[in-house]
Amino acid sequence: CGGSQDNVDGVEPSSNNLDTTTSAQDTTSTTANTVVEESTTTIVQDTTTTTILKNHCDNCEYVSIGELNANINNVPKFAWNDYQRIYDENIKFENETFEIILNIGPSTDLYFLDNEQYLQKGINFWQNFALPDKYYGFFYNYTDLDWAINELNSSGFEGDMARAPCRDGVCSGANSGIYQRPPHFGVGTFGINSSDSIDKYRYGPLHIHEVTHSVVAAQWIGIARNPQQSANDASPCWLNEGIAHAAGLSLGVGTYEEYLDIRSSQVTGRHIRAPFNDYSPSTILKYYNESIPGICIKNPDYVLGYSIGYLTVEAMNAMAGADSAMHMYSVMASGKDFEEAFELTYEISWNDAKPIFAEYVSSVISDLFNS
């Protein structure tokens, strides 16, 4: 989800069949026993255990959780490099069956024309995981809101989903997920507002962020009656937005220098007013503890997923690979809860890891605000 930088409140998730999480911020079943690319991870499952087979990448640089603070300047580089590595491997075998259908409002003037290209880039990165068969993207301004409602209805979705990115006469946010009813297509609504055209986040990172939300929920396709709801019920909110934002920012820009710039602006450019301006380790730890799956979606601090959650996932990526969090979602879809899946993926309990992450993320945010 994405949206306007001016608004620090989260857009309430709609009560329709696409119960995804969104924020009005700018800047905004994986198949067991499936062998994927040599440099990615896979899951092997029997009747009693679930085992994560680690990434095989002899030339990659990773850090252990205990090395995070000593490598505060290397963590973003290691994580960003791994996104590029996996993407470069995946495009050798591009998924040619996935279909993207774009619908653009009749009076909507797009300031960015590569929408499909960046949605596809997100899909290419995640192509070793369970995917929906199709992704529908609806792009519209407020004038075209009624059009969007009708288009969603005629495409088999619920028209009211079109309202999610809109507020106070402006459509500026974004919202994506997996539709409740079979065949569980991915669907995203993208508000278009000309004043957003100055925002670099809107030129690719947003699209990858949004399609990542759909891929997360797709891990429950074929497993749960309502994959999106099951994903929401399984995931802490910091992780839900963290995985999407880390992918969007890392894959949506062309160079590491651009990544560092947008990383800094995303973390420092939002929720800097109380109560969202305290990034002490104790406050971050409290945020982790209150990010309870199935409940946290309504929390007023949901927006912290775009900073604290994002930086936490970036650290996880530097520890175990840029696709490691999606592997964790695959484990959750197989029946494990978040804490079980986290320990299987990162070889440390969440209870032991979270105070270390809190210290690290606090230091990163302090550095970004003071640089």
Which ranges hold each PLM region?
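Active-site-proximal alpha-helical
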Residues: 268-351
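Extracellular mucin-like PTS domains
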Residues: 15, 20-52
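Bacterial lipoprotein signal-peptidase II cleavage site
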Residues: 1-9
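Surface-exposed intrinsically disordered loops and tails
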Residues: 163-178, 190-194, 221-232, 276-300, ...
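Beta/coil-rich, acidic/histidine-enriched accessory regions frequently appended to metallopeptidases
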Residues: 53, 117, 334-371
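Surface-exposed patches in mature extracellular/periplasmic domains of secreted proteins
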Residues: 125-141, 222-227, 235, 255-262, ...
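Zinc-dependent metallopeptidase catalytic helix centered on the HExxH motif
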Residues: 167-272
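Non-catalytic architectural context of zinc metalloproteases
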Residues: 52-200, 204-205, 233, 295, ...
